[in-house]
Amino acid sequence: MLITISPAKTLDYTSPLATTRYTQPELLDYSSQLIDVCKKLTPAQIASLMSISDKLADLNAGRFSEWHPDFTPENARQALLAFKGDVYTGLAAEDFSEDDFDFAQQHLRMLSGLYGVLRPLDLMRPYRLEMGTKLENKAGKDLYSFWGDTITEKLNQALREQGDDVLVNLASDEYFKAVKPKKLNARLIKPVFLDEKNGKFKVISFYAKKARGLMSRFIIQNRLTQPEQLKAFNLDGYFFEAADSSADELVFKRHEQ
């Protein structure tokens, strides 16, 4: 099984590393093309394009200008350990064993506006460029046009290398929109996480994001290989709800905390 997740806006480049091993991102030629576009933007244009504060715009203008594709452990960090949003709180890769990292490297992929597809141990320089950003480029008006079929082709390669045709989509809609399902050589499975509030079950964004990370952790640490095994997911009080599920959409619920 191959797992896809979204990146995070919050980054951590200071806490101790759980592993010293690293790999290089495979789509850096594409990243360099995007950086060339971003380097031409003023901080004011970045603030407007990304709907961020002037302070954040200045930070990211600096990141764009300093970016170069020569990644080392001194100027970059493994992607799985650099991202720090809700998904990554659930994943908690900071306590992974080397065997966990091995399994994750084969079976987990992070989708990225700048890097396209990242493996867990791929080094990454800090950036902010969300997939939904309407950044005009030579291929079109946004990043979806820029990436085209490239992300899908990279996922197909990863599917072949890890040995089956099942993709568990734990990424957000914004990011998975960069994937072309009809060109993906895989059966797509989408877990959905519902939390109870006032007696009704619904998707609550903060909890759902963390649950996507928890599910990723569950697959990695239990070395799951079959879709049927996903139904055993029970971290943090979630349980599988067969009545609301279909073959390719697995619904998990959790009672009010």
UniProtKB/Swiss-Prot annotation:
GO terms for biological process: response to hydroperoxide. It holds the Pfam family H2O2_YaaD. InterPro entries: YaaA. It comes from the Bacteria. One of its GO terms (cellular component) is cytosol. Belongs to the UPF0246 family. HAMAP family: UPF0246. PANTHER family: PEROXIDE STRESS RESISTANCE PROTEIN YAAA, PEROXIDE STRESS RESPONSE PROTEIN YAAA. This is UPF0246 protein PC1_3665. It comes from Pectobacterium carotovorum subsp. carotovorum (strain PC1).
